[in-house]
Amino acid sequence: MTASILEGFSIEVMPRTLAKIDNLEALLPPSTRVYLAHIEGVDFQDMLAAAARLTKAGYQVMPHFPARLMKDVSTLENWIQSYAGEAGISEALLLAGSPRAPQGTLSNSMQLLETGLFDKYH
């Protein structure tokens, strides 16, 4: 028997796309890994609400943590605390992000790790 790739897949969505879908459960099986894309111009509160909705629906949610969109380390800490406390998130995809120039003091994924905050809240 040949396994189908569609027996196991992940998907990436943005909050504005998710907001247009009333019955996500009809499209995605429970426990699907959903990467939540955080691009320039997306408000963190929209990200948080989308993450909470997805978690509540039983998906494995992994929000993006784009370093170049963060103002500073305290912003990173707020995101970690908010995602964990308000949306039940326990995983994250760390990346530099799409803006060429950082919008704050962080510019790459290694700097996010070097803060020690992911270990602190593990």
Regions found by a protein language model. Give the residues of each.
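Active-site beta->alpha loop and helix N-cap motifs at the rims of alpha/beta catalytic domains
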Residues: 1-122
